[in-house]
A protein has these predicted regions:
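A cross-family phosphate/adenosyl-ligand binding-site feature
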Residues: 1-148, 156-224
Length: 224
């Protein structure tokens, strides 16, 4: 299948804190040559504004997305370069558009990544709700037996949320808490963000170079 014919990944961004995780996942997908269908929930726009100062607007989403993807996790603008060719592989769908392509099982998507996923999002998907396009697309992904990765960003977790996470696992989703590791020698907050984003891409089967992989003794010899 040519790159032009490759089916897109749906990326859903919920209202949980952690919009830098979503930006890193998006950069990783685009760097790997993937196409993206982006769904940014209403709640996530408020979080994005708080965390980055960027107001994501449907009418100016390309401009806002470019600024978002260029920004580092430390808030510094123009940390990353994203080409126009990469941005051209992103399609944006309004969160309230329940007639959008990703709302149908016949829409040819590879799968869906929800990054970050709030507990409200987890509950909605676990219960099969379709209050917006993000939840509907996730339900469709499950019923079509496609890959669904849910990067939960919350702590502590209630018993109710844990049960809902189990329900998602049993339905075929990959439940991936946004928990960074420290064995790769992280020195900046971006390293921790990229580790989580890399694990999301690992779960999706998308190659990347976002973090240094464990190869037995990353930090040198260790006594047992």
């Amino acid at each position: 299948m040519s790159q032009q014919q490759r089916r897109p990944w749906i990326v859903g961004v919920s209202g949980a804190s952690g919009t830098p995780f979503a930006a890193s996942v998006l950069r990783g997908l685009l760097a790997a040559g993937e196409s993206v269908d982006l769904v940014v929930s209403r709640a996530s726009r408020l979080t994005l504004l708080d965390e980055t100062g960027i107001a994501f607007r449907d009418a100016h989403w390309r401009e806002d997305l470019r600024g978002w993807l260029a920004r580092g996790a430390d808030g510094k603008p123009d940390t990353f370069a994203v080409s126009q060719a990469e941005l051209d592989r992103v399609r944006h769908w309004a969160a309230g558009d329940l007639a959008a392509g990703p709302s149908s099982g016949s829409y040819p998507a590879q799968g869906m990544l929800i990054v970050p996923a709030s507990t409200a999002c987890v509950a909605g998907v676990a219960l099969g709700l379709s209050k917006d396009l993000l939840q509907r697309a996730a339900s469709v992904t499950l019923k079509e037996r496609r890959k669904l990765v849910v990067a939960v960003r919350e702590t502590p977790l209630s018993g109710q949320t844990l049960k809902q996470m189990v329900a998602l696992d049993e339905a075929g989703a990959v439940v991936l808490p946004a928990s960074p590791a420290f064995y790769a020698g992280a020195t900046h907050i971006q390293d921790l963000v990229d580790f989580v984003a890399g694990r999301v891409l690992d779960a999706a089967g998308v190659p990347h170079q976002l973090y240094r992989r464990w190869e037995g003794e990353l930090g040198g010899s260790r006594s047992s």
